[in-house]
From Swiss-Prot:
<dbReference type="Pfam" id="PF00476">
    <property type="entry name" value="DNA_pol_A"/>
</dbReference>
<dbReference type="InterPro" id="IPR020046">
    <property type="entry name" value="5-3_exonucl_a-hlix_arch_N"/>
</dbReference>
<keyword id="KW-0269">Exonuclease</keyword>
<feature type="domain" description="5'-3' exonuclease">
    <location>
        <begin position="209"/>
        <end position="296"/>
    </location>
</feature>
<keyword id="KW-0235">DNA replication</keyword>
<dbReference type="InterPro" id="IPR036279">
    <property type="entry name" value="5-3_exonuclease_C_sf"/>
</dbReference>
<keyword id="KW-0808">Transferase</keyword>
<dbReference type="GO" id="GO:0008409">
    <property type="term" value="F:5'-3' exonuclease activity"/>
</dbReference>
<keyword id="KW-0239">DNA-directed DNA polymerase</keyword>
<dbReference type="InterPro" id="IPR015361">
    <property type="entry name" value="Taq_pol_thermo_exonuc"/>
</dbReference>
<dbReference type="InterPro" id="IPR008918">
    <property type="entry name" value="HhH2"/>
</dbReference>
<keyword id="KW-0378">Hydrolase</keyword>
<comment type="function">
    <text>A DNA polymerase, required for DNA repair after DNA damage induced by ionizing radiation (IR); this is not the major DNA polymerase. Following severe irradiation (7 kGy of gamma irradiation) genomic DNA is fragmented. DNA is progressively degraded for the first 1.5 hours after IR, in a step promoted by RecA and counterbalanced by DNA Pol I and Pol III, followed by massive DNA synthesis and genome reassembly in the next hour. Optimal priming of DNA synthesis requires both RecA and RadA, Pol III initiates DNA synthesis while both Pol I and Pol III are required for its continuation.</text>
</comment>
<keyword id="KW-0234">DNA repair</keyword>
<dbReference type="GO" id="GO:0006261">
    <property type="term" value="P:DNA-templated DNA replication"/>
</dbReference>
<dbReference type="InterPro" id="IPR002421">
    <property type="entry name" value="5-3_exonuclease"/>
</dbReference>
<dbReference type="GO" id="GO:0003677">
    <property type="term" value="F:DNA binding"/>
</dbReference>
């Protein structure tokens, strides 16, 4: 009896199919033909193939970790769990990792059996989006990713396994699908959830069958999760007993047909289910000979650091950065391929210079010289955007020599050392251990190792800050982070020269050191401090000559001194009224419950309002509202704010849903997290300012992101009441008024717009009057609102369609308004045209101070892409110059405020928040206004609105 034949797919043969590899664009494309490695593995190359079942690991991570979302509400816990395991496995140099996903189409098993996998629970609604993010990160990091149309990930993994075994590789499979047990042998093992390895012995011990019998066993028992029927009434114990007695499924059925199989009840069940068993056998049998084009011995394909950084920033997965950096550093463990799976943490490396500098040979280092200023620091923080992070390593580099700073082990490590007699009672000297005693010993040893690993994670070995005593500045990559870390612990230093700031001025796409090191030195950014110091020193010699005079001046007078200002702001933090925010959260919760009740009443049913899918069904199917747009990712009818706003008046449920979403986001992003982010030692909130994250030169902030606290909603404004002044102080808010419009008037050199600002007119009322041909006194609120919308929207390429939607006016009326607007202010149109011409000719646009942004998309043949780049191009000189002006004002203000006992706390958009002694409030307010308004002289005056109050809200 042949169970894989008769029209079914054989485990040993299958029609050839094309292997498809997911392209960087996200579309399926035929894979590149990669050279096959025919020889045995090179000792210098990976010798272990790690195959990850992508969907299985994503599901495992989703349910293993508590829900986690970023500030935008996007769930990320499956992404975090998946990537941490992937990076952990990939860090070991002996491993080549390949990720395999199920295709988004049905496979041949679905065609054979309509009910295949129909018994599985519905996929959580927020998981597919996370899986797509995982795909994008895997691609960006350069890990091979395979998806084979018509076949499951299991089949691809099975085929890769047999290919790898034929070339002498060890294979480790990360999957929760027990079908993989049919692949196991002495060289192929499955990595279990607890990182133990499952091989033939473990399968036989647990299930009572050999791996060669596994498909027969599954054919008898079936698989409820895949809706594979098996033999009705035959359970695992009976199936194992039958195979132990008869050896194979074929022999079992020979005995059943001959009448020799006992008991009769079992024989009858087998014969009644014979067709189902045959069918189950076919479904369980993996395909092992797919013609996959993959190169063995290559750890990673070319990666894309820019895409990786964009994804990490967008998803706010900052904890993954050190692990990603570690991909290119020294491996943590030895060459034994299973070490990493059996140990939670790496051994501490020896602290000699040769071991500390794996990326460079000694002769090469000797040729590298540091800048004239002297020693350059390299360092490793456990987290680079958190002042509570631990300084894990530091080193200096000078004249070709790297010297690691000594690391001190915390006292807590002693708690992890096992007493000498811990295993004494398990090791009697007069007789060998029993099996039970051996297991108890192994468990105790593993528990002790886990305890050591956990304590080393909670209390890592760190650099003694005394190493930095006597330093006035620290020259390093991302020097602000190191200076802030030291200063908050009492060793006050200033950030010195920083290659990241040089690189950021050369091209704002240079947002982090992995990108910079690769781009300018063709080096990977290492995980160890000595090599980081060496690369930093070399970059500080290579990058400055690349700057022109304008950007060199920006470095010396703006970015470098600002780095110190921002570091001090981070160390100071801002005081937060946690009780107030918690009360506000409770009130928001009450309102959310009320909104939920009203929404359900209008819907006529209860549903999960936070679920886009369920909300889509209620709004567009049940209530039959008109859908205005579809999502790019899934093609579903959109429930985003931009899609619901035009429907606000179409049904009373819409404004309730919009309010629910806003309240829910504010509560989850600010009200609940902020009190937990307050430093228990200082009692203040310490955000981190990102100086090199935004292409226009603007600052951004992390942990928390204070740039996105809304000010238009009532609750958004209320949140600002939670930011308070210290006792004896008051808060002062200084906000540039309409700075981008004023800069537009200056740069576009439009006389009519300049005149309005010089005369101190209401620019929006003046615009409405001039465009509509009215007297300013007769302009009503709606007309002024239309003019305001166009004034601000023109910098972002506002179309007539957008204006029509925003104002609720006919398209023709909106188009006419924009046409007359440009006729009224012809300098604006000239500015746009000139900027685009300049960008096409030079490849970049720039601010008044010379900050550049490169705009290659201006020559794109894709109209949508080109028009988006055009909007970016003529917006950047305005927005970027506004950012430059704010930075200069901060640099000038900082020492003057310090001299009178005041201090800058926050910078948000065009606003500064300052804390001043109560008796100096008027003096500080006047000083701030004067400095900010006179930091640069334009053809129109800069205007700064200043207010004081006990909290941020009351400064307005």
């Amino acid at each position: 009896m042949v169970f894989c034949g008769d029209g079914g797919l054989s485990c040993e043969s299958i029609d050839f199919a094309l292997c498809c590899l997911r392209g960087r664009s996200g579309n399926y494309v035929q894979s590149r033909i990669l050279p096959m490695a025919d020889a045995s593995p090179d000792p210098s190359k990976p010798d272990t193939l790690v195959l990850i079942d992508g969907h299985a690991l994503a599901f495992r991570s989703y349910f293993a970790l508590p829900p986690l979302n970023n500030s935008k509400g996007e769930m990320t816990h499956a992404i975090v769990g998946f990537m941490k395991l992937l990076l952990r496995l990939a860090r070991q140099k002996s491993n080549q990792v390949i990720v395999v996903f199920d295709p988004p189409v049905k496979t041949f098993r679905h065609e054979q059996y309509e009910g295949y996998k129909s018994g599985r629970a519905q996929t959580p609604e927020d998981l597919p989006g996370q899986i797509n993010r995982i795909r994008a990160l895997v691609d960006a990091l350069g890990f091979p990713r395979l998806e084979e149309p018509g076949y499951e990930a299991d089949d691809v993994i099975a085929s890769l396994t047999r290919m790898a075994e034929g070339k002498g590789y060890e294979v480790r499979i990360v999957t929760s699908d027990r079908d993989a047990y049919q692949l196991l042998d002495e060289h192929v093992k499955v990595i279990a959830n607890d990182f133990s390895l499952i091989g033939p012995a473990q399968v036989e011990e647990k299930y009572g069958v050999t791996v060669r019998q596994w498909v027969d066993y599954r054919a008898l028992t079936g698989d409820a999760s895949d809706n594979i029927p098996g033999a009705k009434g035959i359970g695992p114990k009976t199936a194992a007993k039958l195979l132990q007695e008869y050896g194979t499924l074929e022999k079992v059925y020979e005995a059943a047909h001959a009448g020799t199989l006992k008991p009769d009840g079992t024989r009858k069940k087998l014969l009644d289910s014979e067709e189902n068993v045959k069918f189950s056998h076919d479904l369980s049998c993996m395909v092992t000979d797919l013609p996959l084009d993959i190169e063995f011995g290559v750890r990673r394909l070319p990666d894309n650091p820019l895409v990786t950084e964009d994804l990490l920033t967008e998803l706010e997965l900052h904890s993954l950065r050190p692990m990603i950096l570690g991909l290119n550093g020294p491996e943590q463990d030895g060459h034994a391929p299973d070490d990493l799976l059996e140990r939670e943490h790496a051994q501490t490396p020896e602290e000699d210079e040769a071991a500390a500098l794996p990326a460079f040979s000694a002769p090469e280092l000797a040729e590298w010289q540091t800048p004239a200023e002297g020693a350059v620091w390299g360092y490793v923080l456990s987290r680079e955007d958190d002042l509570t992070a631990a300084l894990l390593a530091a080193a200096t580099f000078e004249d070709g020599v790297a010297r690691p700073a000594p690391v001190s082990e915390p006292d807590e490590w002693a708690q992890a050392e096992a007493p000498e007699n811990l295993f004494g009672e398990l090791l009697p000297s007069d007789k060998p251990l029993t099996k039970k005693e051996q297991k108890a010993l192994e468990k105790a040893q593993k528990d002790a190792e886990k305890a050591r690993a956990k304590l080393r994670e909670q209390f890592p070995a760190t650099v003694d800050e005394a190493e930095f005593v006597g330093q006035r500045t620290v020259t390093a990559a991302a020097a602000k982070a190191l200076a802030a870390h030291l200063s908050v612990r009492g060793t006050v230093v200033e950030p010195g020269d920083d290659p990241l700031l040089y690189a950021y001025l050369l091209d704002p796409a240079n947002t982090n050191m992995p990108v910079v090191a690769k781009r300018y030195l063709d080096r990977e950014w290492p995980a160890d401090a000595p090599t980081r110091a060496a690369i930093t020193g070399h970059l500080l010699r290579e990058l400055p000559p690349l700057l022109d005079d304008a950007r060199r001046k920006m470095y010396d007078e703006m970015e470098k001194p600002l780095s110190g200002v921002l570091g001090r702001m981070e160390v100071r933090g801002v005081q937060v009224d946690s009780d107030f925010l918690q009360t506000l959260s409770i009130q928001a919760g009450v309102r959310l419950a009320d909104l939920e009740s009203q929404i359900h009443e209008y819907a006529g049913e209860e549903f999960h309002i936070r679920s886009p899918k369920q909300l889509e069904t209620v709004l567009y199917d049940k209530l039959e509202l008109a859908s205005s747009k579809k999502t790019k990712l899934t093609g579903q009818r959109s429930t985003a704010v931009s899609a619901l706003e035009p429907l606000r008046d179409a049904h009373p449920i819409i404004p309730l849903v919009l309010e629910f979403r806003e309240l829910d986001k504010l509560r989850g992003t600010y009200l609940d997290p902020i009190p937990n982010l307050v430093n228990p030692h200082t009692g203040r909130l310490h955000t981190t300012f990102a100086q090199t994250a935004v292409a226009t030169g603007r600052l951004s902030s992390l942990n928390p992101n204070l740039q996105n606290i809304p000010i238009r909603s009532e609750l958004g404004r209320e949140i600002r009441k939670g930011f308070i002044a210290e006792d004896g102080f008051t808060l002062i808010a200084a906000d540039y008024s309409q700075i981008e419009l004023r800069l537009l008037a200056h740069i576009a050199d439009d006389p009519l717009m300049q005149q309005a600002f010089v005369e101190g007119a209401d620019i929006h009322r003046r615009t409405a009057a001039q465009v509509l041909g009215l007297d300013e006194a007769t302009v009503d609120a709606n007309q002024r609102r239309a003019a305001k919308t166009v004034n601000f929207g023109v910098l972002y390429g506002m179309s007539a369609h957008r204006l029509s939607n925003d104002l609720g006016i006919p398209y023709a009326e909106a188009a006419t308004f924009i046409e007359i607007y440009f006729a009224t202010y012809p300098g604006i149109r000239r500015y746009i045209n000139h900027t685009l011409d300049f960008g096409r000719t030079h490849g970049y646009v720039e601010t008044l101070y010379g900050r550049r942004r490169y705009v290659p998309g201006l020559s794109s043949r894709n109209r949508v892409q080109r028009e988006a780049e055009e909007r970016l191009a003529y917006n950047m000189p305005i927005q970027g110059t506004a950012a430059d002006i704010m930075k200069l004002a901060m640099v000038q203000l900082d020492p003057q405020l310090d001299a009178i006992g005041a201090r800058m706390l926050l910078q948000v958009h065009d606003e500064l928040l300052i804390e001043a002694p109560l008796d100096k409030a008027e003096q500080v307010a006047a000083l701030t206004k004067k400095v900010m308004e006179n930091v640069v002289q334009l053809k129109v005056p800069l205007a700064v609105e200043v207010g004081t109050g006990p909290n941020w809200f009351d400064t307005k």
